[in-house]
Amino acid sequence: LGKLKYNAYPADQYLEKTEILPFNDRQDQREGIKAVERAIAQGSDRCLLAMATGTGKTRLATGLMYRLLESNRFQRVLFLVDRSSLGTQAFKAFESEVINQSQTLAQIYTISDLGIEYDTDIDVQVATVQSLVHRLFNSDDPLPIDYFDCIIIDEAHRGYTLDKEMTEGEDSIRDEAQYLSTYKRVLEYFDATLIGLTATPALHTTEIFGNP
């Protein structure tokens, strides 16, 4: 797999000039999408977007992924969660919410559900931190560092929190200090732009992503 790198200027110009779809009808969602796009165009590879609970972070992420992929700004996006239930919830939203011309994100792009199987033909991979730990650090076939060129981290402030609903293989991370260290290892493994979504930025969150 070659590096997912190219001249980003045309994509940045496209995003600047293209209106956000009515799917993201809330002003805070539209402003958040534009803020992330501006930061990326200005060369930032780490962005933190703080949004109050209930303002539609998953809906914002859906609209943002659509624009970033449609513009060819990024080629393969990882949607990273810290627990399986959040990943399942997000995947169902990608499958069911109509975003453009009567189509859902999952109908427009190839999206892979939770799991440790990774296909080079996918556009969006939904995964937990724990499943990536297994694939990157406990596997004979780790992913290349350029496998993803964009990572969107849902509930980024919870990166240190132990998952009380861990599935098989996820309980190998025993304490919060170890989890935070592993969480940072996963994020720093890939040569990718990081976009963190959070309602309440914690100290470790701003240390990783910078201020919102």
Regions found by a protein language model. Name each.
Residues 1-76, 85, 89-101, 124, ...:
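ATP-dependent helicase/translocase motor core
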Residues 49, 79-80, 194-196:
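Structural beta-sheet core signal
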Residues 52-54, 82-84, 156, 199-202:
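An acidic- and aromatic-residue-enriched active-site/binding cleft used to recognize and process polar
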Residues 55, 81-85, 106-116, 129-134:
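Conserved helicase motor
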Residues 64, 93, 109-113, 136-140, ...:
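Short beta-alpha junctions and helix-cap segments that line functional grooves
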Residues 80, 126-128, 152:
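Structural motif
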Residues 110-125, 142:
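Conserved motor-coupling elements within RecA-like helicase/translocase cores
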Residues 133-140, 144-212:
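Signature of the SF2 helicase/ATPase Hel1-core->accessory helical subdomain module
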